[in-house]
From Swiss-Prot:
Disulfide bonds: none annotated. CDD domains: EF-G, EFG_III, EFG_mtEFG1_IV, EFG_mtEFG_C, EFG_mtEFG_II. Gene3D superfamilies: 3.30.230.10, 3.30.70.240, Elongation Factor G (Translational Gtpase), domain 3 (3.30.70.870), P-loop containing nucleotide triphosphate hydrolases (3.40.50.300), Translation factors (2.40.30.10). It holds the Pfam family EFG_IV. Its main location: cytoplasm. It comes from Leuconostoc mesenteroides subsp. mesenteroides (strain ATCC 8293 / DSM 20343 / BCRC 11652 / CCM 1803 / JCM 6124 / NCDO 523 / NBRC 100496 / NCIMB 8023 / NCTC 12954 / NRRL B-1118 / 37Y). SMART domains: EFG_C, EFG_IV. GO terms for molecular function: GTP binding; GTPase activity; translation elongation factor activity. It is found in: Cytoplasm. Residues 9-292 form the tr-type G domain. GO terms for biological process: ribosome disassembly. This is Elongation factor G. Catalyzes the GTP-dependent ribosomal translocation step during translation elongation. During this step, the ribosome changes from the pre-translocational (PRE) to the post-translocational (POST) state as the newly formed A-site-bound peptidyl-tRNA and P-site-bound deacylated tRNA move to the P and E sites, respectively. Catalyzes the coordinated movement of the two tRNA molecules, the mRNA and conformational changes in the ribosome. Keywords: Cytoplasm, Elongation factor, GTP-binding, Nucleotide-binding, Protein biosynthesis.
Length: 703
């Protein structure tokens, strides 16, 4: 029997999260180098990074899928040489199209490192991932990276955390120098300066703090103590009584406050210049939680419906969450899972309580970004990959066969952008179906539908980049040659009034005829509530056996709305009357009658077309404020606020997605390439009348 190598208190499951280009992947790369996982450092801009292992990631220099890897940390000064820590790291994407990957990673992590660009501070996507981490109660430390970059300003970065994230965060280190002069780091807790002794930053030596920075270091240490004392009673008591606070006491208080989500330690460094990463790893060990420090994970017993606390314990029955599915070119389908409690051996059976199927785990793997080690057994608190699970998808619960539990699943957003994809040959058609199925298993925010009338396949997702990459993967990994249409907005349709309508279908053509007759009341439902069907038939005027056909007929009809053929959403339907014929009535006749009732209702129900509205963050030089305001109003947008961020201005707005296509080019030319923007789906809203008429003209339904 395999033995646990690292006790739970020496295990850390962490995520590295940030805005795109803050240097997340490079930071992870250095972690792997310093923990001995790789022997050569790969740079993202050379396309050689270990964590970016998909072709598209290497070409684009961005991280798309959160690769999981395991590293072992012995301490900056080998202080954990005899008791090393296992650190499981999930590198997450910073691009807004892939926030689903971030959500998915945060769900299974215990702690996170938020990486900031030292010249930009908190950026729009930082705010998004920070909010996501807060939702999942994930303790965080902040690593202000790129301190060697032109414009790097540590104080500005710390201030931006206070202003934009509104949290209690203070520096536990201070950089010596910035930009090209960034040379060392002051540890504010120990009041020592650390200087590198070699080019790769492997050896560092403590020195006295330079004379001109001593006063600043003392002042910043006091600021730190005050911030932690504010949320920690033990420290507050000592502080108020004017007692000396030892290094150990301060570190213990920082840990307590960080775990309680009441304080966020801030560190400085430059991953690219090999400075500060090992100190950040020490902070991961010192301040971020192990599996025993987080609040218990809640599961449900499907038999009794009672809630059960899952506490990391190898002696308890096995329970894990499948948080990612990937297709590996060498070993096939991989299921990444986080083990919450119990242990699991390769070759054993698990119960997938989400799909109510029993599955056999063929092999278990410990993952490094592109390589893997086979292991005999996984323990509570581990993150590992399993081979052989055929019916498991993202968000499924995997538990002991004799102790079945359902773990809280994950919610995935509805796609807002779609494009048509046309296979070039019949052989490509089959390959396309296979590719879509595999890619949708890996990324639940990617969907595909087929238009029943035209036979056209539409793929949908959260943004252009995501769909771009999916099409690229279809070509490279599945050899699908296809023609791709321009991106389109995923419009929806909805009723705005409550109406009653009759659907009557009768056909006599010699022999058995067809007869179905229904009266249905249609009413708008709340946004996002979907379709609700109510059977209010009394006295059997529509026999029981035909009622499911009425519901099925309505559901089919919802796929193509009355105005322009977009899906009809958020609708209540109440079947309250009807009639039937002893001989001629059938399921098919009632199905058709239901769809006729919906068609009839659409004439008076005030049907509208809904469009996705995006929350847009535009960052541009102050001189371009007028341009940006003009861009937003020309695109039917609403400005919601603006703030100054050093030399640039950030404008927040709500803009229809249909108006944002091609905006990157407009903004680039207006700001000479200095403006950037990000957008994320916010809500659906009815389009103005004149635009609705244009959309109907373009996509119009034939009566």
């Amino acid at each position: 029997m395999a033995k646990r190598e690292y006790p739970l208190e020496r295990t850390r499951n962490i995520g590295i999260m940030a805005h795109i280009d803050a240097g997340k992947t490079t930071t992870t790369e250095r972690i792997l180098y310093y923990t001995g996982k790789i022997h050569k450092i790969g740079e993202t801009h050379d396309g050689a990074s270990q964590m970016d292992f998909m072709e598209q990631e290497k070409e684009r220099g961005i991280t798309i899928q959160s690769a999981a890897t395991t590293a072992v940390w012995h301490g900056f000064f080998d202080q954990f040489a005899k008791t090393p820590y296992r650190v499981n790291i999930i590198d997450t994407p910073g691009h807004v199209d892939f926030t689903i990957e971030v959500e998915r990673a945060l769900r299974v992590l215990d702690g996170a490192v938020a990486v900031l660009d030292g010249a930009a501070g908190v950026e729009p996507q930082t705010e998004t991932v920070w909010r996501q981490a807060t939702t999942y109660d994930v303790p965080r430390i902040v690593f202000v990276n790129k301190m060697d970059k032109l414009g790097a300003d540590f104080q500005m970065s710390v201030d931006s955390i206070h202003e934009r994230l509104q949290v209690n965060a203070e520096a536990i280190q201070w950089p010596i120098g910035a930009e090209d002069d960034f040379e060392a780091v002051i540890d504010l807790i120990t009041q020592e300066a650390y200087y590198p002794e070699d080019d790769l930053g492997e050896k560092w030596a403590p020195r006295e703090i330079p004379e001109e920075l001593k006063e600043l270091a003392e002042e910043k240490r006091n600021t730190l103590i005050e911030a932690v004392a504010d949320v920690d009673d033990d420290l507050m008591e000592k502080y108020l009584e004017g007692e000396d606070i030892s290094i150990e006491e301060l570190k213990a208080a920082i840990r307590r406050a960080t775990l309680a989500l009441q304080f966020y330690p801030v560190l400085a460094g430059s991953a690219y210049k090999d400075k500060g990463v090992q100190m950040m790893l020490d902070a991961v060990v010192d301040y971020l939680p192990g599996p025993l420090d987080v609040k218990p994970y809640i599961a449900n017993d499907p038999k009794t419906d009672e809630e059960i606390d899952l506490i990391a314990d190898d002696s308890k029955p096995f329970a894990a969450l499948a948080f990612k599915i990937m297709t590996d070119p060498f070993v096939g389908r991989l299921t990444f899972m986080r083990v919450y409690t119990g242990t699991l051996k390769s070759g054993s059976y698990v119960q997938n309580t989400s799909s109510d199927t029993r599955e056999r785990v063929g092999r278990l793997l410990q993952m490094h970004a592109t390589s893997r080690t086979e292991i005999e057994e996984v323990f509570s608190g581990d993150i590992a990959a399993a081979i052989g699970l055929k019916n498991t998808t993202t968000g499924d619960s995997l538990t002991d066969v004799s102790h079945q539990l359902i773990l809280e699943s994950m919610e995935f957003p509805e796609p807002v952008i779609e494009l048509a994809i046309e296979p070039k040959t019949k052989a490509d058609q089959d390959k396309l179906s296979n590719a879509i199925q595999k890619l949708a298993e890996e990324d639940p925010s990617f969907r595909a539908t087929t238009n029943q009338e035209t036979g056209q396949t539409l793929i949908a997702g959260m943004g252009e980049l995501q769909l771009d990459i999916m099409v690229d993967r279809m070509r490279r990994e599945f050899n699908v040659e296809a023609t791709v249409g321009a991106p389109q907005v995923a419009y929806r349709e909805a009723f705005t009034k409550t109406v009653q309508a009759r659907g009557f279908f009768k056909r006599q053509s010699g022999g058995k005829g067809q007869y179905g007759d229904v009266y249905i009341e249609f009413a708008p439902n709340e946004e996002g509530a979907g379709f609700e069907f109510e059977d209010a038939i009394v006295g059997g005027v529509v026999p029981r056996e035909y009622i499911p056909s009425v519901e099925a007929g309505l559901k089919d009809a919802l796929n193509a709305g009355p105005l322009a053929g977009f899906p009809l959403v958020d609708l209540k339907a109440k079947l309250y009357d009807g009639s039937y014929h002893d001989v001629d009535s059938s399921e098919a006749a009632f199905k058709i009658a239901a769809s006729l009732a919906l068609k009839e209702a659409a004439k008076t129900a005030g049907a509208v077309i809904l469009e996705p509205i995006m929350a847009v963050d535009i960052v541009a030089p102050e001189d371009n404020l007028g341009d940006v305001m003009g861009h937003v109003s020309a695109r039917r947008g609403m400005i919601e606020g603006q703030e100054s961020r050093g030399p640039v201005l950030a404008v927040k707005a709500k803009v229809p997605l249909s108006e944002m296509f091609g905006y990157a080019t407009t903004l680039r030319s207006a700001t000479q390439g200095r403006g950037t923007f990000q957008m994320v789906f916010d809500h659906y809203e009815a389009v103005p009348k004149n635009i609705q008429e244009e959309i109907i003209k373009t996509n119009g339904q034939e009566d």
